[in-house]
Amino acid sequence: MSKQHVLVTGPYGEAGEAILTHMYGDDDYDFTFLNRSDHPEYETHVADIADYEAIRPAFDGQDAVIHLAAQSDAGAGLEGVIEPNIVGTYNVLRAMRDADVPTLIFASSQRVMGLYEEDHAPDLYREDYPSEFDRFRLDHESRPKPDGYYGASKVFGEHICRVHARREGAPHRVYSLRISSVRTSEYDHPYGDAERGVERGDEHTVAEGEVWDQSQTGSWERDSDEYQEMVDRMKASWTSQRDFAHLLECCLADDTVTYDVFYAVSGNAARWFDIEHAQAVLGYEPMDDASEWDGPPNGTRDDV
């Protein structure tokens, strides 16, 4: 079988690291990276996705595109998401149509469903919420409820991808992945976000006379309620790098989908997102479950 030629936009962020760590160098793929800045270790087509003419040559000869490039700040305002997330996504679709690239994996986000979490947290993070007989779970047919302009821009992205899959000829296979809590290798575990908060507190130097409110800087002590709530959230929402890479591989191997939505989340017992649809359609079988961890990496994990 010949290699698949795969273009990755925005490959050097948290989600992209899963590709670099778990897929780059695999004999099945020949990757091209498109990013607005260069990287010392990887050959990169340097261009801003808001500039169609600059990105267009990178799409020639590709079999698939993994579109990760975006303004990923969940708190971004409207002006912050228009060019990278709306214009940029349209440009990627236009370039795929013009270069006749058949397959797109679109990096959507759990923030498309963010108000569900806002309305139900922190109880949502319990394995037995709302009861031991009726687990709260969102699937691909649940109505989007974004929690900000970033999430709304991803709703737009999902819908314009659907339009192109149905109307424009290429791409004619689109996988919208609502990605949940992928982290860099250093924090690729359910305690990662909580430990980052501890580190932020350790790094902060309190100036003379300063009244420092840790909560305003996203920092906390390891034995605090904030730490535990962050652990609870990640035990529900964590997506390990290897599970995310596996889901990408499932999409790249599939030839049945015209357009569909899947949740990129590990097999966490407390997850509030469905993975059964991805299992049934794509053969996704996550290897990780956050409930197996009862401490950060220097602690213990049930399967180690």
Model-derived features: where do they sit?
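Alpha-helical substrate-binding/gating segment
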Residues: 182-184, 190, 194-229, 238-259, ...
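NAD(P)H-binding glycine-rich loop region in Rossmannoid oxidoreductase-like domains
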Residues: 39, 47-87
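Conserved Rossmann-fold NAD(P)-dependent oxidoreductase catalytic core, especially the SDR/UDP-sugar
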Residues: 91-148
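Conserved C-terminal active-site "lid" loop/helix of NAD(P)H-dependent oxidoreductases
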Residues: 223-224, 260-262, 267-285, 300-304
